[in-house]
Structure formats: structure tokens, C-alpha cells
UniProtKB/Swiss-Prot annotation:
Binds 1 copper ion per subunit. Binds 1 zinc ion per subunit. It comes from Paulownia kawakamii. Belongs to the Cu-Zn superoxide dismutase family. This is Superoxide dismutase [Cu-Zn]. Its EC number is 1.15.1.1. PROSITE patterns: SOD_CU_ZN_1. Cu cation binds at H45, H47, H62, H119.
Length: 152
């Protein structure tokens, strides 16, 4: 089993820990807890870079090795890093589990060393009709991020 972990931080008081596990060539399971967010859905993505030298802004676009348009996690056409939304409760926290086949922890398209980003607004899953729907899901600013590092 391969495991990764990302510790989220931000200048806006958002924090959290995201765990990744993958057994063999199976799907990757993502479990996380995030706090300090406004209630409601927030876009949640793996970004292409593990660079936080300029905060979350330097993490690059969504991880997209196949060069596809943005979409929902269950869509055939989507960025590999498109993980949809995490839903935050009235207390400002979210606990979630996501199982996904497009974010391996090994091989040429591994997400180890890449950033995980929580956005300010909901991901419209590429279906919102906004000019940014097919690239970012119109998710607004990047409110927290962390680098997915290999875990022992």
C-alpha cells in the first residue's frame, strides 16, 4: 500500500489534513478534514505543481496529464485532478472520503509531490456555462493548499 498526506494551510485561517491511500493498481482513497471555511460546497482539486512559493497561486492549473476539459469526478471528460466539491457544515468543518481512479500515487501520473487545493466557491463541474467552467469549474480563489507528500 502507498500512502500520502497533505497538510492544508492558508493565510485565511483554513486548515486541514488530507490522506491518500492506494492498494496496488486500485483506485486512490482520499480522506480529509478541513476547518475554517464558510458553509456550503467548495471546489477541491489536485493541482499540477507542488510549488507554494507564492502561496496557493503557484500550484499551477488542475492536474491534467490527458489534456482534457474540466468536468465532474464521474465524467469521462475531466482533468485527473477534478475531485468535485467538499461540503462544509454550519460549523465551518468538512469531513469527507473520495475514491478516484485518476489520481494514482505511483507511476508516471502520480500525484505525490503535487498540491491539493480547496477553493472559495463551489465547482460547477464544467456545466455552469461560465467562461471558466471548462477550465476551473469557476471555483473562485484558492483558500487553502498543501503538498501531497509520501507517507511511511
Amino acid at each position: 500500500m502507498v500512502k500520502g498526506v497533505a497538510v492544508l494551510s492558508s493565510s485565511e485561517g483554513v486548515s486541514g489534513t488530507i490522506y491518500f491511500t492506494q492498494e496496488g493498481d486500485g483506485p486512490t482513497t482520499v480522506t480529509g478534514n478541513v476547518s475554517g471555511l464558510k458553509p456550503g460546497p467548495h471546489g477541491f482539486h489536485v493541482h499540477a505543481l507542488g510549488d507554494t512559493t507564492n502561496g496557493c497561486l503557484s500550484t499551477g492549473p488542475h492536474f491534467n496529464p490527458a489534456g482534457k476539459e474540466h468536468g465532474a469526478p464521474d465524467d469521462e471528460v475531466r482533468h485527473a485532478g477534478d475531485l468535485g466539491n467538499v461540503t462544509v457544515g454550519e460549523d465551518g468543518t468538512a469531513a469527507f472520503t473520495i475514491v478516484d481512479k485518476q489520481i494514482p500515487l505511483t507511476g508516471p501520473h502520480s500525484i505525490i509531490g503535487r498540491a491539493v487545493v480547496v477553493h472559495a466557491d463551489p465547482d460547477d463541474l464544467g456545466k455552469g456555462g461560465h467562461e471558466l467552467s471548462k477550465t476551473t469549474g469557476n471555483t473562485g480563489g484558492r483558500v487553502a493548499c498543501g503538498i501531497n507528500g509520501l507517507q511511511g
